[in-house]
């Protein structure tokens, strides 16, 4: 519909903003219902025409916020705190995951056979969340700048992005433990639900039943033992259950857990006994990049100068000069995803900086590792694989192993480096075997649900927030999660 707007002596034709336009603006700008209504009012006033905005906006906003109301339940559950005492916590969860998936497929016009499901687990902003993404297998995204032809809020988001993500369960103000994850998984009843799981390494270890910390058998996917310099036998779900049963029958002594592959809890994965863990669980693209990048940065800090303090000061100055900010997910000196990528690409500048202080010769082997890993990330960690990715992995692995053999105490093989060396190629071959596609690690990346914490926090603060002591807190939190998910359909 076209609306005629008087402007002085001239007349201009302006497209009427539809209800759908406002729903898109509400989502893309992070507006509350009240703010969206105010925006519509300002547009009507500014154009001096009530018809500049399609009627029925208020009703549509309310309807959109409640589209999934019947599919989410609020419960109070008992969670053990650090002192071993039970505390009541609020859990919001989807009471019918299958129906939710069918609703999403219908709303998005997708066929189930042409989609992949991805589950994510992560704690952020005080709450433990379990998320679902439905991804189009043949999705091809338009690149380049948004144009006016795209319309209001016209930028299209990938099917696996934060803006299309569903939060299936939220456990408020709770620790990240085996028991809390178990509560959520059992409520959602995932049996026979075909989905790939990805998360950070700590969470993946919880899911397969391993204890936390510095483990003798720290790989999620195989039975390799420290120093993790060799490829182990890939786990099947039945292997994990057998190890756990043997651990329990031997008395369940955690001091002897290394004799049982560190499997101290029953695995929480719902899959066929003979299924491999690798494939059902995806190597976490983001956390592999963060972990390996941080490891190489710390080696530079510890080995190039006479003291680690000098090394840290040098790296801090270098990062500041490159406008690379610190404070990542691991500690106040670590880097987040984009910053890690910039650090990996800044090797020429890093060479120049070390050469200025006469330390390039000592730093050069690690700088070469950074370059090699940067090539690996470019070819492997994206949504689509680039040619030569297997060679890039092999070259990085060979270079790191050579330094490990020369100095095993410095160039230790962490679980993340082990996964990059031995399991990333295996996984990508599995991922693309049936379809012949060239999908990279980014296809099953955990980045979308890493971002969901800040996205939800913005909405929570913007008109939804109530105190946990509020008498109706559980229902308020449920309505919030329903609205968040309903606006992501």
What are these regions (language model features)?
Residues 1-489:
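A structural signal for the principal folded core domain
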């Amino acid at each position: 519909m076209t609306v005629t707007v008087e402007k002085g002596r001239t007349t201009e034709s302006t497209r009427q903003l539809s209800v759908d336009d406002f729903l898109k603006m509400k989502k893309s700008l992070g507006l509350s219902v009240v703010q969206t209504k105010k925006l519509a009012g300002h547009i009507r006033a500014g154009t001096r025409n009530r018809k500049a905005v399609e009627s029925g906006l208020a009703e549509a906003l309310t309807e959109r916020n409640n589209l999934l109301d019947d599919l989410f339940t609020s419960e109070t559950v008992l969670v053990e705190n650090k002192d071993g005492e039970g505390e009541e916590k609020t859990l919001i969860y989807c009471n019918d995951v299958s129906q939710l998936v069918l609703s999403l497929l219908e709303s998005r016009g997708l066929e189930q056979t042409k989609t992949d499901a991805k589950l994510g687990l992560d704690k952020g902003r005080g709450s433990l969340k379990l998320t679902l993404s439905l991804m189009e297998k043949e999705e091809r995204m338009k690149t380049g700048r948004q144009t006016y032809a795209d319309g209001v809020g016209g930028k299209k988001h990938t099917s696996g992005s934060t803006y299309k993500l569903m939060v299936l369960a939220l456990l408020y103000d709770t620790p990240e433990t085996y028991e809390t994850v178990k509560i959520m998984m059992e409520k959602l009843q995932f049996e026979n639900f075909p989905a790939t799981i990805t998360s950070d390494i700590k969470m993946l270890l919880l899911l397969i039943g391993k204890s936390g910390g510095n483990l003798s058998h720290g790989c999620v996917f195989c039975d390799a033992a420290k120093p993790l310099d060799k490829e182990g036998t890939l786990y099947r779900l039945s292997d994990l259950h057998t190890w756990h049963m043997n651990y329990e029958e031997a008395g369940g002594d955690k001091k002897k857990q290394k004799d049982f592959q560190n499997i101290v809890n029953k695995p929480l994965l719902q899959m066929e006994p003979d299924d491999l863990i690798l494939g059902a669980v995806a190597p976490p693209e983001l956390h592999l990049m963060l972990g390996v990048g941080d490891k190489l940065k710390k080696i530079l800090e510890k080995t190039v100068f006479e003291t680690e303090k000098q090394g840290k000061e040098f790296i801090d100055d270098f990062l500041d000069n490159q406008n690379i900010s610190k404070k990542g997910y691991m500690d106040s000196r670590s880097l987040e995803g984009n910053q890690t990528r910039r650090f990996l690409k800044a090797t020429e500048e890093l060479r120049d900086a070390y050469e200025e202080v006469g330390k390039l010769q000592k730093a050069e082997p690690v700088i070469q590792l950074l370059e090699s890993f940067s090539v690996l990330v470019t070819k492997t960690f994206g949504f689509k694989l680039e040619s030569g990715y297997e060679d890039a992995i092999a070259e990085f692995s060979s270079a790191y192993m050579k330094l490990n053999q020369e100095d095993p105490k410095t160039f230790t093989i962490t679980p993340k480096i082990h996964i990059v060396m031995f399991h990333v190629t295996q996984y990508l071959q599995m991922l693309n075997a049936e379809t012949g596609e060239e999908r990279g690690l980014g296809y099953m990346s955990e980045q979308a649900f890493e971002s969901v914490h800040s996205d939800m926090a913005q909405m929570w603060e913007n008109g939804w927030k109530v105190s946990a002591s509020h008498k109706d807190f559980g229902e308020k939190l449920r309505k919030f999660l329903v609205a968040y998910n309903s606006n992501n359909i």
